[in-house]
């Protein structure tokens, strides 16, 4: 169960990072 939580947290972190980069790119563009 700990492993699943860690994997989910990692997935959310990656998605959040990509979303943030896309948002910044749109603001700059």
From Swiss-Prot:
It is a single-pass membrane protein. GO terms for cellular component: plasma membrane. The keyword Membrane applies. It is found in: Cell inner membrane. One of its GO terms (biological process) is DNA damage response. Keywords: Cell cycle, Cell division, Cell inner membrane, Cell membrane, Membrane, Stress response, Transmembrane, Transmembrane helix. Inhibits cell division by binding directly to FtsW to prevent the final constriction of the FtsZ ring. This is Cell division inhibitor SidA. It comes from Caulobacter vibrioides (strain NA1000 / CB15N) (Caulobacter crescentus).
